[in-house]
C-alpha cells in the first residue's frame, strides 16, 4: 500500500516510521524549508528498541495514495491541506478534538475519512528522528476502516502498538477529548498525547 503522512512531527513521524518499517511505501509531507538535507532513513527511539526505515519526502502530494495519515496541529489543518493535490483512498486523522472530522469530510468526502485517535508521548528531536517517551502507543480507529486498514493494524500490533477498531465514532472521538479535559482540569501528570517538535 502507498501511505503519506501530512504533519511529520512527533506523532506523524512516529506513525510514518512504524508503517515504513513494515515494508510499506511511505511519503512524509514536510514544509519546503525542511526538504533540503532531510534524511532518506527515518528512525524512532523507543523503550522497546529503535526502528529505522526508508521513507520518501515531498512538499506536496501529487499522486493518489491508499492512506493519508494526518497529524498536524488542529489550527494548522486547513492550511496544511493545501499540500494535498490528489484524492487519497482513505484519510486517517490523528488530531486532538472532534471538529476536524467534519472539516475533512467536507474536503474529501464523508466515506473517505476514518476517524482515529492516538495516545502516546513522543517528540521530534531532529528532521527524520523521533523519540517515543511513553511505553505505549494506543491507536483507536473507526470500525468503518477495518476492511482497508485491518492488515496494517494487525502488523502494527507486532510493533507493540495497542490497536482497536471502535464501532461508534462519537464514542471514539469524545472518549479521548473527555480524558484530555479531565487531565488538564485535575492536573494529572500522565501525558496521553505529546506533540513536540512539529
Explain the meaning of each model-derived region.
Residues 87, 106-112, 127-198:
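Internal alpha-helical scaffold of NAD(P)-dependent oxidoreductase catalytic cores
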Residues 33, 98, 117-122, 145, ...:
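Glycine-rich beta-alpha junction loops
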Residues 34-39, 100-102, 147-149:
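Short, charged/polar "capping" segments at the starts of alpha-helices
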Residues 1-50:
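NAD(P)+-binding Rossmann beta1-loop-alpha1 motif at the extreme N-terminus of oxidoreductases
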Residues 5, 69-70, 141:
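Hydrophobic Val/Ile/Leu positions in short beta-strands of Rossmann-like dinucleotide-binding domains
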Amino acid at each position: 500500500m502507498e501511505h503519506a503522512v501530512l504533519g511529520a512531527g512527533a506523532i506523524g513521524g512516529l506513525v510514518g516510521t512504524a508503517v515504513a518499517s513494515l515494508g510499506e511505501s511511505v511519503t512524509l509531507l514536510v514544509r519546503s524549508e525542511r526538504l533540503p538535507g532531510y534524511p532518506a532513513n527515518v528512525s524512532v527511539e523507543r523503550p522497546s528498541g529503535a526502528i529505522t526505515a526508508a521513507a520518501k519526502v515531498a512538499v506536496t502530494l501529487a499522486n493518489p495514495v491508499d492512506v493519508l495519515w494526518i497529524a498536524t496541529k488542529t489550527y494548522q489543518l486547513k492550511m496544511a491541506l493545501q499540500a494535498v493535490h490528489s484524492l487519497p483512498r482513505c484519510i486517517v486523522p490523528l488530531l486532538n478534538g472532534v471538529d476536524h472530522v467534519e472539516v475533512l469530510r467536507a474536503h474529501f468526502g464523508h466515506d473517505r475519512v476514518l476517524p482515529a485517535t492516538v495516545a502516546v508521548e513522543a517528540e521530534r528531536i531532529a528532521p527524520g528522528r523521533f523519540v517515543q517517551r511513553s511505553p505505549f502507543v494506543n491507536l483507536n480507529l473507526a470500525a468503518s476502516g477495518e476492511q482497508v486498514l485491518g492488515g496494517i493494524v494487525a502488523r502494527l500490533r507486532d510493533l507493540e502498538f495497542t490497536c482497536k477498531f471502535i464501532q461508534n465514532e462519537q464514542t471514539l472521538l469524545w472518549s479521548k477529548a473527555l480524558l484530555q479535559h479531565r487531565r488538564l482540569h485535575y492536573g494529572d501528570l500522565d501525558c496521553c498525547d505529546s506533540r513536540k517538535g512539529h
